[in-house]
């Protein structure tokens, strides 16, 4: 689901003035405003930023038909994007293998995950200051540029750069849609609406593998990306149009009086430079990238860990992270991360859970498709079905979770007593079952466990951060939660790549028969070469054993980190969302 995990997965009636603490966070469940108290105040929030006021005005003037149309278009956009995601996931090992660098499958995603996660906090400011439609349009543009670059790439460096553009755009677009849902749904219905929007995964999961096969066996992977570079802008335009039309309608109705600013162009540049904390973003993104990338790239250096490049990247990355912390505390006029929101234990706990889930997920998932194709001798299509059990199960189960949240009015119990424990069970069992000569049915069973658990955790962690704050801060806390998830994903991919590059080539060289040892480097770097050896041959058995050893260490690490997530879930307040109304206007 969020890209599904992830991606990971991912309101306006008249309201009474919410009771909030100084940071804008809601108090304990007993202090939340009651639904009966919020009957007749249609005016816009006086202290809200321009983007929030714009969406409040928009939802007061649009019709029920426009609201339904917007949700239908969001579903269609999600359908197309998830279909493209499924295809891309199946193509990725072949794209990197085409450059003889299959082991960089995880590395190509590390930088994109870091930047894709960090971009959401500045994007939250864009949405709150300038408006939702503007942010949506910018992100669609970035996504399209990424697809065009992937279609035209001739080396793994260009492909990695394309991944950055793509994931910035995709994560940003998904995030904007999440904010739209938060703007247009009552809190008690929000989990169900998030689940509805993610439901296309249930259908598109069956299409990704066959679609990748069609392009690989036909015009090539480049046309796979090129086709969606045309389709994506076409299907996103109607949603932007309905946003823009109703904003104009609200403006014409006088709900949004013009604001004049006396700043010059230079003053505006300076204002937004500090408002978006550009220095902080550069320090954090550069520091994380330089610190994490060497763990997956060291095996390509002659001296490996003793390489001056690897050592200098780790040291400089660490120093930049320290510089970021010092700058944010002592020098930044506007902090990149809203630390005052993180003081709330529910927000902090949800963010830590998101990070730990993504660390775990990307540790065990990064080479899962390759494992299935090599060790279990599955086709791309068959492997995609098993990999995507998570997407199917999580999206289906999230609908059940949404109904349970609406019925019970609470969400903590679902994560604490079901979601996180079942995730630990599913990942832990795979330590034994994801090995050569083990019946694939056991792997499928574990995937189902993790899928139902994931559908619970993703929805409840998002509900936790939204329920703990007022409408004014929803965009920010969702951005913070997503940033933790994406950085967790980057860390998980780093750990996966480090384990893979440290274990697989060493065990491969150890297990290969003497006559094949000269080809170890070629086998290590190319999935198609690995598949070329017949099943049952000494070379294929050696490759399978090396895969099994690498997977075992990945799964041990993925299971261990989940203990942090269980503790984080215990931190949440047990907020009753039935009694809490955040939004204005016509909502679901």
UniProtKB/Swiss-Prot annotation:
What residues form the membrane-spanning segments? 60-80, 104-124, 133-153, 161-181, 191-211, 225-245, 278-298, 307-327, 348-368, 385-405, 413-433, 440-460, 473-495, 552-572
Identify the glycosylated residues: 519
One GO cellular component term noted in the UniProt record for this chain:
plasma membrane
What is this protein's expression induced by?
Expression is induced during iron deprivation.
Record's subcellular location: Membrane
Would the keyword Ribosomal protein be found if you checked this record's keyword annotation?
A: no
- Superkingdom of the source species: Eukaryota
Q: Please report which protein family the annotation says this sequence is part of.
A: Belongs to the major facilitator superfamily.
Q: What does this protein do?
A: Major facilitator transporter involved in siderophore transport.
Q: What is this protein called?
A: MFS siderochrome iron transporter 1
